[in-house]
Amino acid sequence: MSRRLAATSLLLALVLVAAGRAQPSRRPKYGGTLRVEIGAVVNSPDLAVSAANSNEAFAKNEIAALLYDHRNPDGTFAGVPGSGPFRISEWEPGKRAVLAANENYRGGRPFVDSVEIQMGRSARDRLLDLELGKADVAEILPEEARRASERGMRVSTSEPDELLAVVFVSGRPPAEDARAREALARSIDRAAIVNFILQKEGEPAGGLLPQWSSGTAFLFSTSPDAPAAKDLWAQIGGSPKIVLGYDASDPLEQSVAERIVVNAREAGIAISAEANANAASSPAKDGARLMRLRMISPYPREALMDFVAVLGPIVGPDTSPLQENAAAQQIYEREREIVSSYRVVPLVWLPQVYGLGARVRNWKAPAAGEGWPFTDVWLEENPQ
């Protein structure tokens, strides 16, 4: 009897301890302004106005996803601005935007009353504002993710869904020489780009789709082959030179371009890297340029067909869409056909990285094709 009493007493004590440690449940709350900081400068929310660079194009699409009712499978937006979860209440071109919650949104009103977006903030200032509690959500460069986490910040990292690639410009020598294209492709040390430039926050890319999406990325080599690159380049007469363009406003592209130049020159390739003020076009001297391609869908067929549409004739004569029920083998064969031309040279896959403030609740890292998850985020009044 005493043993039963002792066991009961012990059980009761454990229950009381557990109850004392239990935290009160947190329920979603409406209200507040979500403070967001980004590096891009968006001059106009109008989708008809072209973006000056890839960073502005991405931010513009993210904002549009909050303003329109929904996004179609092909990535276009449906409805009119303001039919989505938010509407524009203030817009200072290139500096600041305030989006107010749409009370009549068919998907339900967002939890926050508004989203304030500060544009053109430097990477350093974004991290500092997160630490000081002046920002709730801020973009973090992939190469800064590990350092931010070590400093105790909440860091959200998505699946790698943005491809950084070298794209050869049609009609410009030596881009029209297949040996030159292959030589450059084989000279690049992708692992070094991931390990040293990206600080291991990314993946080497040999194909146009990531492993988590297609399941066949491992079939594409990502290893450098400097001897083969040197042999290919030696076959080309006339000592051609490749000019590799990159976005002048993108420090990551600059670092990658400079690394490619080092690798290529070690293989005897004549190459130089030059900054372009307008990433939307390539100067006549550029034979190749760095390009960012973001997946519009986690599904391999949809993502690959979007890349084909964006790249156009660069990928080759066959730009016809794959059937909706295309088998994995068919998707792989089309991908292999494009990569084997060396007109598009995949380099690395990049994730979306965000730093989160203490007030932010219910954040979910966006999947490929998804926009900023501000509709479902709510703010804790007194975070612990």
Language model features: what each stretch is:
Residues 35-38, 85, 113-114, 132, ...:
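Alpha-helical secondary-structure segments
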Residues 356-384:
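Long beta-strand-rich cores associated with HINT superfamily self-processing modules
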Residues 37-83:
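N-terminal lobe/hinge region of extracytoplasmic solute-binding protein
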Residues 199, 203-235, 248-255:
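Structural transition elements
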Residues 278-326:
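Acidic-aromatic pocket-rim loops
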Residues 93, 234-296:
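Ligand/substrate-recognition segments at binding pockets and active sites
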Residues 104-147:
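Ligand-site clamp/hinge motif
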Residues 63-110, 114, 124, 227, ...:
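Gly/Pro-rich hinge or "lid" segments in bacterial periplasmic/extracellular proteins
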